[in-house]
Regions:
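Short, conserved loop/helix-junction motifs that constitute active-site signature segments
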Residues: 34-36, 54-61, 128-129, 152-157
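Short internal beta-strands
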Residues: 43, 62-69, 161-165
């Protein structure tokens, strides 16, 4: 059976393909790789560089979860689609209000992935459950910088942490990604694919 794969499109955008071939897009906007029809689309907040749904080929059954559905009346929602479970979690900083932004924990095929969204270090990060992969923004302008993200990585119980959203207006900035220091760091450039393992 084929393994799940993460294709990093650049900026804050990435695509996950499950073992069964289901396709998940997170914060669509940047790069390429939107050719596969979506089964699920996750939007962490409604900034233009995270919610370009027009790039995606929708199917009749495609489900779209946006921040306004994921955080209702102060409660972070859980979604069970059968083949995947999604738990919304806090995401916020001075540029992104707690009320309008979320992160997501994705559970499928024995894996857990943390899609942090646009955020800085939050009090709640230390309380998140163990996870296989965490993707953290490190641009230092609209989100935390690489140093702060390194502190977040130490808070998380993650097997691997991947720095994304590395520079405003750029798909990927390798030099800034290198500034992210964590013993469990994985560097993934825009256009690269990672096989996800339990």
């Amino acid at each position: 059976m084929a393994a799940s794969k993460l294709y990093y499109q650049g900026h804050g955008s990435y695509r996950i393909t499950t073992e069964e071939g289901r396709v998940i897009y997170v914060d669509p906007y940047a790069g390429d790789g939107y050719d596969l029809p979506a089964d699920l689309v996750l939007v962490t907040h409604e900034h233009y560089d995270h919610n370009a749904l027009d790039k995606i080929s929708m199917q009749e059954h495609t489900q779209v979860i946006r921040s306004e559905q994921a955080l209702t009346q102060g409660t972070y929602q859980k979604f069970d689609l059968g083949w995947i479970q999604i738990q919304a979690v806090p995401a916020y900083n001075k540029n992104h209000s707690r009320e309008n932004c979320v992160g997501y924990l994705l559970y499928w095929d024995g894996l857990c992935l943390y899609a942090s969204g646009d955020t800085s270090e939050t009090e709640e990060m230390a309380e998140l459950p163990p996870m296989d992969y965490a993707l953290l923004p490190i641009d230092g302008v609209y989100n935390m910088d690489a140093e702060e993200a390194s502190r977040c990585a130490a808070k998380l119980s993650a097997r691997w942490v991947i720095p994304i959203h590395t520079k405003p207006g750029a798909l990927y900035d390798r030099a800034n990604a290198e500034r992210f220091q964590a013993p469990n760091r994985l560097l993934l450039a825009a256009g690269e694919t990672l096989e996800l393992k339990e």
